[in-house]
């Protein structure tokens, strides 16, 4: 069977799976076309899709039962595992790295939970970075008094459960840190009992010491632990580092020291601070090969940062630690879908802004019988000007997503926002969802899952294509200084790490102080005030705060995904 491959699959791997009948003769042949993103990763900084529990439920539960009736699958999808990028043999786009959050997981590993199986029973050789749930503490979602030495039984039980989960599920994980933005949020501070920077530092130290004392240990098959660095400005970030760095020191803790670093707060969105911190780590002997081989940047969604972090990773490998890897994550592919947004193209304009573009998608019950190919329909009907095909969207028709049919109202009835749910107004009732309800949307829960998978592929390929283009000589505007010597970012980073001593390296960083102000960080920060301004990702900034450059993914509301998950039938 010969397939006509779309443009993006020209470099795909094709596996031939031959099914034999009982007599041994060939009964049929199926070609599984895989876009092997693991093979395309090369030496780039590693993007980790932050797996949504909503999405993982489809993969996991289908292993035990027909959670989705196979008759609901679009033509070409024969196995839910095709949507599981952690499955190297069956996935449409194998990719072996991901992030899973303990904050959203069922932490009780003593009982089978098929909705968790995508992560719990993943293929050997795949990589999971476990997030510990500090965000849930700060938001008050994990109830309890989280202050150091509070004696709170609820908080202690959660510490025990999350460490056990991380030790048994992840390859690397984050410490149970308290994000410093909590001290600027009165509601959050009240929920967790932490309202000052010293209290956040003390609570994190308490959690660090618990993790250090009770971790399984790498030699015993346990997870490696990343020391999370917080701070909402340069001063507090420096204070946090000086306080917490000892936990990664093998001289002080030869058997239980932490195994790398995670950049949170201002550390993960401020290039000046990132470079200064790496120089400090180098000269504090805390980037040792085989000891501190991993650094993760939390919640990093800017496409240009995929290239920026690759440049930094390569410099550290060249001059400090050949085994060093930088990873970064975001949940944008899942959040976007929950907000009705779908990635439709990635944009790479030399010496300009690089970005993934997302927009409101087709959601109309008139499409419930529309057999047009999805990409054809959304462009023809003006929903998108362009559509970049993914291995998932390539299978879809309009009716595969817009699954619910509209009802037929009685003659003379005008449906409104107030009355459209009244069954007495219909001759033929609208389709109902799994919960026996009907609403305005034409999507069922599997529609969301399919488009989430598409969005993940779009995000992953955007990151890889950005690095490929950069290596070929193209660059986003922020990777070159716009004034003065017009220095390229990679040349400056090379000079910093090639410097003969710490002072020289720090002087080079200081020399380019105005350039660092040009680089837009995660959550849109840009400008000199980032050195002192607070960093809270849950607020919408005004220009009274640091200048910002926001993108669609900055405005996605996490509540939409939480609502979707809460309505999901487990």
Model-based region annotation:
Residues 3, 8:
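Cationic, low-complexity basic patches in intrinsically disordered or flexible, solvent-exposed regions
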Residues 14-30, 220-407, 412:
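Glycine-rich phosphate/ribose-binding loops and adjacent secondary-structure elements
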Residues 322-569:
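Gly/Ser/Thr/Ala-enriched C-terminal appendages of enzymes
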């Amino acid at each position: 069977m010969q397939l006509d491959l779309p443009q993006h699959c020209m470099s795909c791997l094709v596996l031939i799976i031959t099914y034999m009948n009982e007599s041994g003769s060939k009964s049929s042949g199926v070609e599984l076309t895989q876009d092997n993103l693991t093979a395309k990763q090369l030496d780039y900084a590693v993007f980790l899709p932050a797996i949504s529990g909503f999405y993982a439920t489809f993969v996991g539960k289908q292993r035990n039962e027909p959670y989705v009736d196979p008759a609901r699958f679009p033509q070409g999808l024969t196995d839910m595992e095709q949507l599981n990028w952690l499955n190297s043999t069956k996935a449409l786009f194998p990719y072996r790295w991901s992030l899973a959050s303990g904050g959203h997981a069922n932490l009780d590993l003593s009982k089978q939970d098929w909705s968790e199986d995508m992560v719990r029973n993943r293929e050997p050789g795949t990589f999971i970075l476990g997030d510990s749930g500090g965000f849930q503490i700060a938001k008050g979602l994990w109830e309890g008094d989280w202050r150091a030495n509070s004696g709170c039984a609820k908080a202690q039980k959660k510490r025990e459960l999350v460490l056990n989960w991380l030790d048994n599920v992840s390859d690397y994980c984050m410490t149970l840190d308290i994000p410093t933005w909590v001290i600027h949020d009165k509601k959050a501070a009240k929920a967790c009992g932490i309202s000052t920077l010293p209290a956040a530092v003390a609570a994190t130290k308490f959690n660090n010491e618990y993790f250090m004392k009770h971790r399984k240990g790498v030699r015993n098959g346990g997870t490696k632990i990343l020391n999370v660095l917080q701070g909402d400005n340069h001063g507090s970030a420096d204070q946090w580092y000086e306080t917490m760095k000892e936990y990664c020191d093998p001289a002080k803790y030869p058997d239980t020291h932490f195994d790398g670093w995670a950049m949170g707060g201002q550390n993960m969105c401020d290039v000046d601070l990132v470079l200064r911190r790496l120089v400090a780590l180098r000269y504090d002997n805390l980037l040792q090969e085989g000891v501190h081989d991993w650094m993760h940047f939390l919640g990093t969604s800017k496409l240009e940062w995929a290239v920026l972090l690759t440049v930094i990773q390569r410099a550290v490998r060249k001059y400090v630690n050949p085994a060093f890897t930088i990873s970064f994550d975001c949940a944008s592919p899942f959040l976007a879908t929950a907000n009705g947004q779908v990635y439709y193209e990635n944009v790479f304009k030399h010496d300009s802004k690089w970005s993934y573009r997302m927009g409101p998608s087709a959601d109309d019950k008139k499409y419930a019988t529309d057999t047009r190919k999805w990409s054809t329909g959304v462009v023809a009907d003006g929903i998108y000007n362009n559509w970049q095909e993914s291995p998932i969207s390539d299978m879809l028709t309009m009716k595969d997503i817009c699954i619910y049919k509209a009802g037929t109202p009685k003659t003379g009835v005008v449906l409104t926002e107030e009355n459209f749910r009244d069954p007495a107004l219909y001759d033929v009732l609208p389709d109902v969802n799994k919960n026996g309800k009907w609403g305005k949307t034409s999507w069922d829960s599997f529609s969301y899952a399919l488009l989430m998978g598409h969005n993940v592929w779009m995000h992953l390929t955007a990151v890889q294509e950005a690095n490929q283009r950069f290596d070929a000589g193209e660059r986003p505007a922020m990777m070159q200084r716009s004034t003065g010597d017009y220095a390229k970012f990679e040349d400056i980073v090379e000079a910093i790490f090639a410097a003969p001593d710490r002072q020289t390296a720090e002087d080079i960083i200081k020399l380019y102080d105005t350039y660092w102000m040009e680089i837009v960080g995660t959550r849109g920060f840009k400008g000199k005030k980032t050195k002192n301004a607070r960093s809270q990702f849950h607020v919408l900034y005004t220009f009274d705060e640091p200048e910002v450059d926001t993108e669609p993914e900055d405005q996605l509301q996490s509540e939409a995904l939480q609502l979707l998950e809460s309505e999901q039938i487990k």
